[in-house]
Amino acid sequence: MTYQFSHDDLIWKALGDARRRLIIEVLATGPKQTGDLVQLFPDIGRTGVLKHIDVLTEGGIIHVRREGRTRWNHLDPEPIRSVCNSWVAKHIDGIKSSATKLKLIAEKEQ
């Protein structure tokens, strides 16, 4: 039996690497050519950067537009926002409960 990755799994995978998070931060300032992104990581070269771009594209975080031989990479922050909001919503009740308890303890001590 093999596990099927959900779309959310692909987004978390994309966010799980520091280099991919840096690519996201750079693209948050605007679209960049692939060559610009390659310059950020001289240690892994073009092939390594393209593999990271592929993971981000698979998660829907980056959209690539080709103009001739030039690849423009565009950030779509919505998938990140969606999985983060969903994850926080699942855990917020416990956080609210802890905060309420902390407030009650603090008020008793006064």
Regions found by a protein language model. Give the residues of each.
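Amphipathic alpha-helical dimerization/coiled-coil segments
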Residues: M1-H7, E25, R81-Q110
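N-terminal helix-turn-helix DNA-binding core of bacterial DNA-binding proteins
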Residues: S6-T47, T70-S82, S86
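A cross-family signal for key residues in well-ordered alpha-helices
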Residues: K13, E25, T57, H63, ...
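Charge-dense, helix-prone N-terminal extensions
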Residues: Q33, I62, A106-Q110
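Conserved catalytic core of two-component sensor histidine kinases
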Residues: L50
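Short, hydrophobic-biased segments on the C-terminal half of alpha helices
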Residues: I53-D54
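Beta-hairpin "wing" of winged helix-turn-helix
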Residues: E58-G68, H74
